[in-house]
């Protein structure tokens, strides 16, 4: 996405305002290996760059922290889908093995599910209006 909402400062600010710590997946002096990311410090938003150019220097510098994915052999980088999968697998495994309360509250799950349903159904506004008018009769 190339709109103004994609500017690094706006993205990082919105994530922080929503209560997330931002962690760039990039080599930075303070970067930690994926398996050492502190999950006790609260909700985290991982930042991934494009396969060609990675994260912008502004995003890397502006993130609250950074992590790197350990690689072995002759590999210098993973493509984006592999990087995301490796991070999600490791962090999910660690969260499930921890005492951290990481699941979404029931109300938040319902909101996300309803949002997904609305985005999945054609003419959802018309269907909701019809349903509402029929209930009011």
Language-model region placement:
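Post-transcriptional modification and biogenesis factors for structured RNAs
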Residues: 1-137
């Amino acid at each position: 996405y190339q709109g103004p909402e994609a500017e690094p400062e706006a993205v990082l600010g919105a994530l922080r305002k929503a209560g997330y710590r931002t962690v760039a997946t990039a080599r930075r002096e303070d970067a930690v290996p994926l398996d050492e990311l502190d999950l006790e410090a609260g909700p985290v938003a991982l930042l991934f760059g494009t396969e060609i150019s990675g994260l912008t220097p502004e995003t890397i510098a502006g993130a609250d922290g950074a992590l790197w994915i350990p690689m072995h052999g002759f590999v210098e980088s993973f493509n984006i889908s592999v990087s995301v999968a490796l991070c999600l697998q490791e962090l999910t495994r660690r969260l499930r093995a921890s005492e951290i309360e990481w699941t979404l509250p029931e109300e938040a799950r319902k909101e996300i599910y309803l949002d997904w349903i609305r985005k999945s159904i054609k003419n959802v506004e018309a269907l909701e209006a019809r349903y509402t008018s029929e209930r009011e009769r």
